[in-house]
Amino acid sequence: MPISYRMLLILTLYIFELCRCVDASERPVVKTEEGVVEGIRLDAGGEKVDAFLGIPYATPPVGNLRFERPLPAKPWKGKYNASSKPAPCMQSDFPIYQDIVLDYTHSSEDCLYYNVWRPTRSCPDDTETCNAKLPVMVFIHGGGFQFGDSSLFLYDLSHLAVRSNIVTVSFNYRLNFFGFLTTETADMPGNMGMWDQVLFLKWINKNIAYFGGDPNEVTVAGHSAGGVSAGLLAASPATKGLLKRIIMQSGTPLSLLAGSTYYSPDKFYDVSRTLGCHNGQAKKKDLDLPKTIKCLKKLDARKIIRSLLRLNLGQRVFSPQEGDDFFPYDPLAMDTWKNVHVKEVFAGSNLNEGTGFLSYILKHHHDLADNLKVDYRATITAMLSLFADVPLVTGKRMVKAYFGGYEVKHEGQKVVELLSEMMGDIVFKCPTHLYSELMALQGLPSYRYLFAYRPSYSIFPKWFGVVHSEELPFALGSLIFSTDPTRTSIATDSLPRGFLGRSYTTNETAFMRQLMDTWGSFVSTGKPSIPLRDDEWPSYTKTRHDIVQLMPFNYTIRFDKSQDKCELYRPFMIRKGAGKQPRLRIVSPGIAASSGKPISPAVASGANRQPGNNVAMSLVACCLLMAMRHLFATIV
C-alpha cells in the first residue's frame, strides 16, 4: 500500500522529534537563581558526566567596574549555552619551559565564569532541579596570583566528579594588576581577586543545590596560590558559613603572604606614572587619587599588560594584602588562626619542591650562580638577610642545618641540591607544617601528605626529583585528558606538537585512581583514605607529626623529618602574641570594619606596617611566582 504524503510528513516529523529528544538528552538543563543553563554530557573515565561550562557568576568587571568589588551576574532569559570553557582573566603570555609559551592573547577582563561537573547518574531524570545533595569540591587554580585559568585541561574535574560521586567546580578570579592593585585607602582598597572568590562562594551557597550539590558540604581546595587562597578564605570574616573543609596543595597563607610579600607603599604611584596617569611631578601625598583611578579605568587592558612587562618583577607583582574587611588580621600572628571557621584541614607538598625554582633562578641570575661557587655559605646567609630579614647569626645556623659545619665541604651539584632542599622547606614544607600545627592547636582534625612519586613522563633531569605541581593530574584525575585534544584550551594551541599527549603507564593510571579516592574521601567525610589498606590516616598534632607519603600502591605513614629545620623558620613565619585585635589597614569608606570607629590616617595609609617586613620573605613569593613557569613542563 503506497504511503500517502500526509503519512510521510507525520513519519518525518516523528523521526525529527525523536532525534531532537535524543539530542536533548545529551544537553542537561539546570535552573539557577540567574536563569536556565544548558550543559553538555561528556565521557570521563568510562562514565557519563554532566558538564556546565563557562557560566557567569558576576557582572563583567570592565569600564567603571574595573578595580571594584564584583557584582552578581545579571539574570538572563532563555537558556544559557554552557558548553564551552571561559576565557582566562587578563594576563601576559606565560613562558613554560625554554621556548615553549602559553598563548594568553585571548585573555579578557570579562572572565568571571565558572564550570560545574556532576555524575550523570546522580540526576537521572533530566529535570531542571536535582536533589542528589552530593558533597562539593570548589577548586582554585594557582599561578602566584599573576597567572592561571580554570580552562586548562589540568583543572578538568569531570573524572574526579564521577569517580568520587561528588560535584566539582572550578572558576576564574581576577589576577595581577586587575585583581590586586590598591591605593591602600578607601578609594581603591584592592583584593578584588579575593572578593571574586568570596562572591563565588556565596553563589555556591545559593545555587549549587540546583546542580545536585549540598551547600552545607563544601570543600575549598587549591594549589599553590590557590592553596593560599583556601587558607585565607577559611579565616576571612566574609566567608563564615560558606565552606566546611579546605585542601591546600603546595601552598598555605604562611607561604605567600609571610612578611607582606612584595609590598611597597609607592607601588600605586609608580605604576600609575608608568601607565601615563600622572607625570610624576606631584608628590605621592598630593596625588589626586580619584582622578588617577579614573584614568586607569579608561586604559586599554592589553596595553596595560604590555606596559607592565617593561617593569622589573617586584614592580609588576600584585598579591593579596591584609588590612581590609576581607582579611583584617595579621597573617603572621598566631592568634589570627583562632578565627578559622572550617571543620577539617588536609594539606601537603611534594618531595622536591625547590629544585625547579632554583634551576630557573640560577639559569637567569648568573651572578648568584657565580657567588655560590665562590662561597656558598656566605652567599646563602646574605640572601636570607636581604630577602627575609634574618639576622646573620640565625642565617648561619640555618645554613649549618643543611650544609653541616665549616669542616664539611660541598661542591657543584651537591650545593645546588642542598640549597634546593632549603628553598623547598622555606616556601612549602615548613609553612605547611606550621599551618597544620596551628590548625591542630585549634582542635581541628588536620591531615598531612607528602607526594613522593616522580612520573615516568617527566622531562626534567632526574636530580630534580618530584617537583612542584606533579601531584595535580593524579589527584584531580586529569591525567587522562592530557592526550585528549577536546579537553585542551586555546592557551595550549601554541604548544609544539607532541608536547601534550605524553604516554603514561597503567600503574600511573591506578595511582591516579588511588589519589582521587583519597581526595574524594576527604571531600565526602572530612578524612582522607588510605587505599588498599584498613589503616586510618593519622591526625597531625602538636606532639605527633605523622604524614602519609604517597607512592603508587604504597601509602606509607612516616614521621615528618623536616620539623627540626622548620623550627628555625618559626619566628619568621609566626609571631606570638601579635594580632589579637584586627590590624586594619584598609576599610570601607570612613568606618573601621571591626570597631565601627572612623579609621585613623595612620592606619589608612598603611603606617602600621613594620618597616623590617616590607620585603621580608619576598624570596618566597619569587619562588611561588616562578612555579607556574614549570607547571606544564612538570605534568606533560
Q: Which residues make up each language-model segment?
A:
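Substrate-gating cap/lid region and adjacent catalytic-acid/histidine neighborhood
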Residues: 295-509
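Serine-hydrolase-like catalytic core of hydrolytic proteins
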Residues: 14, 101-289, 325-327, 333-358, ...
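Non-transmembrane alpha-helical segments in soluble domains
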Residues: 137, 198-201, 205, 231-234, ...
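Non-catalytic accessory segments of hydrolases
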Residues: 2, 14-194, 215, 485-517, ...
